[in-house]
A protein has these predicted regions:
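Phosphate-binding chemistry for phosphorylated carbohydrates and sugar-nucleotides
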Residues: 1-165
Length: 166
């Protein structure tokens, strides 16, 4: 994960980093979506500057929020082979988590998660993640009642992260 001191950020060539203002540690100070908007990386303030919050760290926070908001529920987390090993081998306590490791790419995350079935009134308790900021989340199907789709949506990832932090 990339980190910068406040001074380093002020001298960066990247416009976002140059313009980030000092903030309390843990404050989200920026976010970046990729070109087609399906990935999200977040910039948070630290004690000495800033850090990038990658997909694995986003997934970790989402799981902690799930444990707090719906303890003892069953979740399925799929992560690509590039993800942090700790994410799959030592998931958050308070949840029953089935983990799966997949090839790189949101396609393979979706293939693995679809095995759970995507039918029901309640949102399926599953998501997939790549360290690159690609988080595959369930979304209600726009035309089929009680059916769910899987989407990689950077804006939805950002909103999910912000809600999990609150």
């Amino acid at each position: 994960t990339d980190t910068w001191t406040i001074e380093e950020a002020m001298n960066e060539s990247h416009l976002l980093l140059r313009n980030v203002q000092p903030a309390a540690a843990g404050t989200v100070v920026g976010a970046a979506l990729d070109g087609d908007g399906d990935r999200c990386l977040i910039i948070e303030a630290t004690e000495t500057g800033y850090k990038v919050v990658d997909g694995d760290a986003i997934a970790d926070l989402l799981l902690k929020a799930a444990a707090k908001n719906s303890p003892n529920s069953q979740w399925h987390l799929a992560a690509s082979i590039e993800s942090d090993l700790a994410l799959l081998s030592n998931p958050c306590s308070g949840l029953e988590i089935m983990t799966s490791e997949t090839a790189v790419g949101d396609r393979w995350l979706s293939v693995e998660l679809r095995k759970n079935g995507l039918v029901g009134e309640e949102m399926p308790k599953l998501f997939g993640v790549e360290d690159s900021g690609h988080v595959v989340l369930p979304s209600s199907h726009p035309q089929l009642e009680n059916q769910w789709s899987l989407v990689g949506d950077g804006a939805a990832t950002l909103v999910s992260y912000l809600l999990a932090k609150s």
